[in-house]
Amino acid sequence: MPGIFTRWRQFGRRYFWPHLLLGMVAASLGLPALNNNAEPAAPAEASTSHTGTLRSFDSLALISETSRRSASFGVDYWQQHAIRTVIRHLSFAMAPQALPMAMEESLPLNAQHLALLDTLSAMLTQDLQPAAAQVQPAPRLLPPLSFTVSAWIRQVQGIRAGPRLLA
């Protein structure tokens, strides 16, 4: 039984976690552009009377997330780390060959490596314009009709008996 746990731990350390991190970085390469263009999902209907407050907190989080994302102009730290790692590996792979015949055979591969290096370095050095933050107007809050004890208890205690609004 301990052998199974040891093998599982080694599998996780050697294969699972590095590949999971690499997959997350690779999958997120296109997400900042999509997040700025997509419309945010409508907040779920809350059971309390503070839906306006909840919506404003949601939009506050959306604005802070947008400003945090736009500060890096679309490429965050982990994406830059992955790109730099690939550039490093490609530069070591493109080290001068000792044999001249091996150099002639690998010319198409070197051209492909050079194109990939050029593209990756352009991704790191290119200054993209940050996407404009889409700020939604705050929802209108309806003024209370009049103060009643039953309405106050309903709001504070969460008790609801009868219609929500008087048509």
From Swiss-Prot:
One cellular component term from this protein's GO annotations in UniProt: periplasmic space
UniProt xrefs under InterPro entries: SecM
Molecular function GO terms recorded: translation regulator activity
Signal peptide range: 1-38
Coiled coil: none
Keywords: Cytoplasm, Periplasm, Signal
Pfam families noted in UniProt: SecM
Subcellular location: Cytoplasm, Cytosol; Periplasm
Family affiliation: Belongs to the SecM family.
HAMAP family, alphabetized: SecM
Function, as annotated: Regulates secA expression by translational coupling of the secM secA operon. Translational pausing at a specific Pro residue 5 residues before the end of the protein may allow disruption of a mRNA repressor helix that normally suppresses secA translation initiation.
The name this protein goes by in its record: Secretion monitor
Lineage: Bacteria, Pseudomonadati, Pseudomonadota, Gammaproteobacteria, Enterobacterales
